[in-house]
């Protein structure tokens, strides 16, 4: 009963794969190692569907390839490739669901809404945090309803189809455990080790303590990074350990990588503000529903991550692996913002404005290339 709070899908798949591997190799150790190939499959599939999603946004070519680099060279995905846990398939299923939702939005084919509902349902059956996509999904349906005056009956029918498939898949396990074992809907037992405790830190320290901003690494469980935002930025790149221990030459590129990541996070927030302004002034943008989708998803996931870190004040609660679903909306927001600036620059503008627009749109491909090179170097040389 202690582990009934876990959604079962990943563990069922991994369990049968483990039994199959044990029978084939006659070695439980080899079978356990073989589960890493399952994680690699999840990461590869997530990357392919993320590329499909970026293609659906009809980005300029150089912005599209910049998005590919930012997503596929995100170190969290490197860590996930050999990581046997439910976080990896949760990311995969959520990305698959987003892709088919976008295809449904463009084509209005019920087959795509069936696939999206299955992807979402399997995602929640893997990890409950996939439910954080619900507000973004609702925003997409609302955009579709508001722009389809003559087809609203069909849209409502597709919405009902989505609910009929997704809800039983998503909540069946939770309802079963509540009926049989009186389990709460969202129950996380306190399993964190003593050395990770942040519960005596004030709210101000959890948000505004930037005393550790100069250090790119966290070394759990002795970490002192009470700041939720910094901890997530660091663990996105390097996990919960100091990679420079035993390899001092990795510190300089890691520090540069860390500073670049902070800058990209700032650009993401600025990009949200810019896209909101553009959405309010330009009523004809074809990407507006997807802009709203990613902004709502990004804000929801960050809000959830903050609440989770405050409710469970431990180092592990700010580990980026728990919120890796942020990788896609962050990448998409940066790409949508750069594409918007590039397209506005194609119109007639003054000389200084044109120069600024050119610099802004060239920044993302250059930053993405540097991001990919640093990420690859650190994880090839640093490990």
Range-by-range predicted roles:
Residues 76-90:
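Short acidic/glycine- and proline-prone juxtamembrane loop motifs at membrane-interface regions
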Residues 33-58, 96, 270-274:
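Transmembrane-helix motifs of polytopic, lipid-linked glycan transferases
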Residues 157-269:
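Membrane-lumen/periplasm interface segments of specific transmembrane helices
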Residues 26-29, 45-73, 92:
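Transmembrane-helix signature of polytopic, membrane-embedded enzymes
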